[in-house]
Swiss-Prot record:
Residue ranges of the TM segments: none
InterPro entries: 3-IsopropMal_deHydase_lsu, Acnase/IPM_dHydase_lsu_aba_1/3, Acoase/IPM_deHydtase_lsu_aba, Aconitase_4Fe-4S_BS, Aconitase_4Fe-4S_dom, IPM_dehydratase_rel_enz, IPMI_cat
Record GO biological process: L-leucine biosynthetic process
Name of protein: 3-isopropylmalate dehydratase large subunit
Complexes and interactors: Heterodimer of LeuC and LeuD.
Organism: Rhizobium rhizogenes (strain K84 / ATCC BAA-868)
GO molecular function, one term: 4 iron, 4 sulfur cluster binding
Metabolic or biological pathway, per its Swiss-Prot or TrEMBL entry: Amino-acid biosynthesis; L-leucine biosynthesis; L-leucine from 3-methyl-2-oxobutanoate: step 2/4
Keywords (A to Z) from UniProt: 4Fe-4S, Amino-acid biosynthesis, Branched-chain amino acid biosynthesis, Iron, Iron-sulfur, Leucine biosynthesis, Lyase, Metal-binding
Amino acid sequence: MSAPRTLYDKIWDDHLVDSQDDGTCLLYIDRHLVHEVTSPQAFEGLRMTGRKVRAPEKTLAVVDHNVPTSPDRHLGIKNEESRIQVEALATNAAEFGVQYYSASDKRQGIVHIIGPEQGFTLPGMTIVCGDSHTSTHGAFGSLAHGIGTSEVEHVLATQTLIQKKAKNMLVRVDGQLPAGVTAKDIILAIIGEIGTAGGTGYVIEYAGEAIRALSMEGRMTICNMSIEGGARAGLIAPDETTFEYIKGKPRSPTGEALEQAIAYWKTLQTDEGAHYDRVVVLDAAALPPIVSWGSSPEDVVSVQGIVPNPDEIQDENKRTSKWRALDYMGLKPGTPMTEINIDRVFIGSCTNGRIEDLRAVAKVVEGKTVASTVDAMIVPGSGLVKEQAEAEGLDKIFKAAGFDWREPGCSMCLAMNDDRLKPGERCASTSNRNFEGRQGFKGRTHLVSPAMAAAAAIAGHFVDIREWN
């Protein structure tokens, strides 16, 4: 009888083509997502060696990082480098027979949002993309992670990837979330607990009552930020919530094929007694709405907390690093988080740009007005999310409140398009990274949930969504 296995072990074993004595392994890849930034050199490499894309039907390309999100984006991209990358993806997709969603296609959107909504992402699969937040797809019980440009070429050519197996970590979130606390708060709390290096060398499986209670959108938010916790990937075992989400998607199996798939997907659970190399447990009931204060996703406190004092940190290097973060962020120790005023609000990204996120925002801002000191924008994660939001009348609520309602794309999550912060501007953002310059040169980013960002836009400063009226 074989030893009990984790979910990660099972998916790994199912895709193992070959293994060497030094631990180097060759994995079969089921799905490959491609965007305009990390793919041009990969396609050029194929061209130079006379190779083809081995499995174009398992490859899906979309523009997201560089595309403008303004209503006039049909007029083209101003930045020459960005324009060349977008044009190259269109050319490469056509030449190599890969399905491609252009900016004018309503299916276009952020790569990690379009995969699931098209049914391209399915449980038990290995999924890669030249983008670190590929971990998002792990919400379906698939092994998904980012790869480098040379690896993009390798997968295009061979449909395989050279890897070494990571260790297993379990993060269990027990109990029920209080009102006003969301999946975004869970993952920020986890990163605050383990640190940005806490998951290094691991694949994290998320489990527990609070995780099971999440929608697929919430689970994607959790897995999306696994990389910010240092992990290679994040996984959540599939269940009825997963199966219901998948049904009816354009590329999902149907009929008898779906029944057979679900029978297999139900086996994608960690066996009782399986070994984890590390276990972390959080109590959901104790979690507050969370705000980041520094320039690392581990720099987090409760919205009712204060900016911490780095002098209380024992480690000298870490103490110096946190003082630098405070200097960059323009904050002083002891400042209550609710007294921090903001200039900008960005709601969107592959972390929080889905319909559930937009509904949460609408609930907060309906009948209210964005503060006169705040410039706030909402960027749907895909054309289909935008279409759904408008069908529900959410866009009217946003516009009436004074939000800028945009076209789909990565937008202000990263300073690679026209949406960016000016030096010194402070932003409440639903994205995943608050590094120096991430949203624009000398821009200051605070990571929060969609509801918290929405409330901050109205108040002009951070507020506790649990007390919001």
